[in-house]
Amino acid sequence: ELPGQKSRQEADAIRLRQALLPQLTVPKNQNMPLQQTGIRLSRALPYILHCSAKVELARQQVQLIFSNTGEQVAVFHVYNKLDLEAIPRRYMVEAGKQLDDIWSVHDGGYDLWVLGPNGFHRSFQGNLHSKLYSESLPEIRICVEECEPKIYLKLRSDGQKTAKLVIQANAYLNKSWHIETRTAETELLLDMSEWYGWYDFTVSLENEPEFKRRFAGRIETGKDSYSDPFIGYSV
């Protein structure tokens, strides 16, 4: 018999006594709790994750490629925002491994939302029926160095024509860049040292509002850092 164990009668008696106690009054005006602002020390994490998209125009498909160059297994969650009734796909990627999967488009369109640990976020949107998009097929991937909080943004065109891309910082950096892609990769360096490796930016295609790529998260360098400076703020 466990210490402190009560019989049913004893438990019922306790419940009845508690029911006779003064009840809490629910406030008429209620507010949602607010996240405390400011940064906190944050341990280094063993995740170095990558996710990029590749469009297969002839098959009307989108391929997502997941890679884990960190030291621990990681899980990616993918939501199809054009079919939210579908069960999200989940991928467990071992350290040093890579895998991929295919999504069919809906009337040419796709909108895939990828989530991972510690704020890792990728969003891939587009419409393959768009002439401007299908002729240029721009794609973007992120490369990082494991020792510095810097991003090497690599942009290219997989189509027959060049693409004019706009890179817009959503937080941290108050900047935007305009880059014309070619078949050979164009590289843009973003130094996020001032923000402890945290980043959030969107890449869009000029004159094509349906194409977007969003990248957010924290660059892991193997060193202890700080929590997200924008927690508690509206972005």
Show the residue positions of the predicted features.
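Membrane-interface soluble catalytic domains
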Residues: 1-235
